[in-house]
Amino acid sequence: MTKIETLVERARRLKEKGLTTEEIADELNVSRETALWLITRVGETPPSDIYVEWRELTKPSRLRLVAMAMADMIVSEVKEDIEVVVGIATSGIPLAAMVAEELGCEFTIYYPRKFKTDEEKPKGGILSENFARVSGKKCAIVDDITSTGRSIKEAIEVIEANDGKAVCAAVIVNKRGGNEIEGIPLLSMLKILRI
């Protein structure tokens, strides 16, 4: 089975489990357009995208090392003390919790708009009320991969709407390019650039 066939099969299984196209895209670390193509196979060739397989890093001992490196990157690049690490659901949560522990600060979760029903989407994403509050605090946003930057942009807006200050975003893989989102630094352990 080729990598594309494997992705098509994974997308099909996720769809059968009831996941939306956006949730499948998040689970497979591909764009929404690519996830839709994997499900429907409309058109001969897939959209231009880069698939990132980072499953080997998700073993807790390995993820801890990634979190240590990410925390070090944040401390090196950001001159302000981080008070809250905001993990973007779902794949950014475990990494963000470990980064918060490394930085010795609080942790919370941001649920992006893409995980809401169509009627809930106009209200935007939300910060969890079960974890730290961001009001009056300097925040670092953490996710595994950014493709468009949409979830990070939403998180910045929600943090600011809750009287917090987003001072940076950090990801393992940056598929979108660029070094900032909404005026804050976008720190990337790996940046993928098309030539």
Curated annotation (Swiss-Prot):
Which of UniProt's keywords are assigned here? DNA-binding, Transcription, Transcription regulation
What SUPFAM superfamilies does the entry give?
A: PRTase-like
Q: Name one Pfam family in it.
A: Pribosyltran
For the keyword Transcription, the answer is yes
Its GO biological process annotations read: pyrimidine nucleobase biosynthetic process; regulation of gene expression; UMP biosynthetic process
Which superkingdom heads the taxonomic lineage of this protein's source? Archaea
Q: Which Gene3D superfamilies would you find in this protein's record? A: 3.40.50.2020
Q: Which GO terms describe its molecular function?
A: DNA binding; orotate phosphoribosyltransferase activity
PANTHER family per UniProt:
OROTATE PHOSPHORIBOSYLTRANSFERASE, PYRE-LIKE PROTEIN
- Which family would the database say this protein is a member of? Belongs to the purine/pyrimidine phosphoribosyltransferase family. GfcR subfamily.
- Record remark on domains: Contains an N-terminal DNA-binding winged helix-turn-helix domain and a C-terminal regulatory domain (or effector binding domain) resembling phosphoribosyltransferase (PRT) domain.
Q: Under which name does UniProt file this protein? A: Transcriptional regulator GfcR
Which species expresses this protein natively? Archaeoglobus fulgidus (strain ATCC 49558 / DSM 4304 / JCM 9628 / NBRC 100126 / VC-16)
Its ancestry begins with:
Archaea, Methanobacteriati, Methanobacteriota, Archaeoglobi, Archaeoglobales
